[in-house]
Structures are given as C-alpha cells and as structure tokens.
Regions:
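Hydrophobic membrane-targeting segments
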Residues: 1-37
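Pore-lining and gate-forming transmembrane alpha-helices of multi-pass membrane transport proteins
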Residues: 6, 139-166, 170
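Lipid-exposed faces of alpha-helical membrane segments in multi-pass integral membrane proteins
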Residues: 8-21, 107-117, 158
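Predominantly long cytosolic amphipathic alpha-helical stalk/bundle segments
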Residues: 31-117, 121-135, 165-194
C-alpha cells in the first residue's frame, strides 16, 4: 500500500512540475500583452489606424490581440454592443489564461492527503508487526515510524510549492486581465469619440 502511495505522490509531483512550467511559459507578460501591440494601441487615433492595429493583431496572436481584433471588426456596431461583445470574449480569454490552475489547486488538496494515507498504511504495518513480535527492539520501531512519516513529508513538499505557484499564477492572471481591460477600454473610448 505504501508503495502505491509513493507512486501516486511521484505522479502528482511530475504533474505539478509540468503544470507549473506550462503556466509559467503561457503567462509571460509579453506573450499575453505584447509591447508592440501596446505601443500601436497608444498611437491609434483613428479608424484608419485601427486597421493597421488589426493587421498587427493577426501577425502576433495573443489574448490582447484577439480582443482588439474582435473590437476592430465590430467598430461599425454601436458602442454598447461592441463593449458587450468584448466583455464576453474577455471572459473566454481569462478562462483560457486560468487553464491548468485547477490542477495545482487539486494537488494542493490531495498531496498531503496521499502522504497521510501512506503514513497511516505504514503505521498499520509497523504496529501490526509490533503486535506479532512484541516491543523487543525500540530502535527498530523508531526507524519504522521515521520511514513511514516520509510519506507525509513528501505530500507536504509537493503541496507547498503547488500552493505558492497556484497563488502566484492566480494573481498574475488577475493583473493581466486588468491590464487587458484597461487597454481595451482606452482603445474603445478613442474609437467612439464624437
């Protein structure tokens, strides 16, 4: 039983590292909010400029680029309808940015529990053996208890970094979402000036 727990903890740790690497790569600031697009948005003053921005969005796909491209495509819509459409698309982009974070959240919960299951299974084995042989060798008992507590330690060593990165990535998604919202809002305000 303890071996199965260690295998599950090993799989959990590999998944944790993979998700952390994947999200770190996907949530790079410059890939979500490309600086060249931010500059183009700041320089965009007319509907003619908006066509150039749209072209830039097509060449450099990013969450911000997809939102701006959608907005440019709907500039002939009434402002409120364009904003509603943008808000819906933004929610989809945020869900896309949050992808994988639930895996880290689950690992935070299950890794310590898997460790605890390993510890309990090991304790049952140690005390079962103790019941059969008696308490003749206290050092052997202490070694057995130390060995089985490693499962709890392993679970915690997986859960703690998972919690740290889950918190970090969740906050980063929030900050990126606010930045995209601000840039889109400024762009729409300039395009619908009367």
């Amino acid at each position: 039983m303890e071996n199965a727990v260690y295998v599950l903890l090993g799989i959990t740790s590999v998944v944790c590292v993979a998700v952390i690497g994947w999200r770190a790569w996907m949530l790079r600031w410059n890939s979500v909010v490309p600086p060249e697009l931010v500059t183009a948005l700041a320089d965009c003053r007319s509907r003619e400029d908006a066509k150039n921005v749209r072209s830039l969005c097509e060449k450099n796909p990013s969450p911000l680029g997809r939102l701006i491209r959608l907005t440019v495509d709907r500039l002939d819509w009434p402002k409120d309808d364009n904003i509603d459409s943008l808000e819906t698309a933004a929610r989809h982009e945020i869900v896309h940015l949050e992808r994988g974070l639930v895996v880290l959240e689950v690992i935070v919960g299950i890794a310590p529990l898997l460790g605890l299951v390993g510890t309990i299974a090991g304790m049952m084995t140690v005390f079962g053996d103790l019941g059969q042989t008696g308490l003749n060798d206290a050092a052997k008992l202490a070694q057995g208890i130390a060995l089985i507590l490693r499962a709890t330690l392993a679970g915690l060593l997986i859960a703690i970094p998972s919690l740290i990165f889950w918190s970090y990535f969740s906050k980063k998604v929030e900050v990126l979402a606010v930045e995209m919202e601000t840039l889109c809002d400024e762009f729409i305000r300039r395009q619908y000036r009367k």
